[in-house]
C-alpha cells in the first residue's frame, strides 16, 4: 500500500525529513490503523517477512508483526514515531498535512483501507506521541 508514502511526503515536506526516516516514523501508526481491514495481508507480513512463529489469533499475529517491524527500525537506529524523529507537529500542522495529502489525490486513498481526511489526521496524531 503506497498510502504511508503519501502521508510521509507531506510530513517530510513540512519538516524537511528524509523519506526513509519519515516512513519509519509513520509506518507503525499507519499499520496499526489499517491492519484490521486487511488482516490476512498483515498475518502474511508477520509470518513471511518478520518471522513471527508464535501462535495466536490472526489479530495477535498481525500486531506481533507490526511490533517486530518497530523493533527492527530501532535495531538500525531508525525512529518509529514523530517524537523519536525529533518533530512535534501541532494540530494545525497535522490538519494541513492531511488536507494536502487528500488534495494531491482528489479522493480517499489506500488499498489496505481507503483513508479519508479524518483517517489521515488520526494516523498523524497517533504518530505524534
Locate the predicted segments by residue:
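C-terminal charged capping/lid subdomain of soluble metabolic enzymes
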Residues: 42, 49-129
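Active-site segments that bind and position negatively charged phosphate/pyrophosphate groups
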Residues: 1-68
Amino acid at each position: 500500500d503506497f498510502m504511508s508514502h503519501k502521508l510521509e511526503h507531506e510530513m517530510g515536506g513540512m519538516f524537511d525529513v528524509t523519506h526513509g526516516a519519515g516512513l519509519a516514523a509513520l509506518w507503525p501508526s499507519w499499520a496499526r490503523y489499517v491492519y484490521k481491514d486487511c488482516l490476512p495481508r498483515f498475518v502474511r507480513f508477520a509470518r513471511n517477512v518478520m518471522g513471527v512463529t508464535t501462535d495466536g489469533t490472526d489479530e495477535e499475529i498481525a500486531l506481533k508483526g507490526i511490533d517486530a517491524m518497530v523493533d527492527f527500525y530501532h535495531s538500525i537506529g531508525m525512529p518509529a514515531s514523530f517524537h523519536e524523529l525529533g518533530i512535534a507537529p501541532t494540530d494545525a500542522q497535522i490538519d494541513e498535512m492531511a488536507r494536502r495529502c487528500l488534495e494531491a489525490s482528489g479522493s480517499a486513498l489506500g488499498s489496505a483501507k481507503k483513508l479519508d481526511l479524518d483517517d489521515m489526521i488520526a494516523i498523524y496524531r497517533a504518530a505524534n506521541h
